[in-house]
Amino acid sequence: MAINLLPFFQHLIIKCGERGVMIVMRVSRQTKWASERSNIRGRYVVSGGSGNVDIVVLHHFPANILPQESIVNVTGAGDTLVASVLASLVQNPRGFEDPESLRKIVEDAQAAATLTLKSQFAVSPSLSL
């Protein structure tokens, strides 16, 4: 289903709760993704047809392992993740164009969501500037 939305949205971030995050995107052949090949261990698929069409990338990031007893409140964890991704994209608007910067963006977002899961608040106060 997400692939069917790519003509309308270049990047999709699908929050999967305790299963992690799925990024589905189309990127230009001028990005670093052009030199990547699908990597099952890396949890991503890179597909590009012939010619000058965009590349489609599906990348799964598993959730951080967190003992059940350390989870205080799930409210706001997904919102925290999305807010962190958006804040990273403000700093680096081309962050999705490079596999390493995408990994860093999602890792930071998952770390922020983990802080919120361990907090009694909807957003962990430790995330405030």
Where do the PLM segments sit?
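Conserved phosphate-binding/catalytic region of the ribokinase-like
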Residues: 1-129
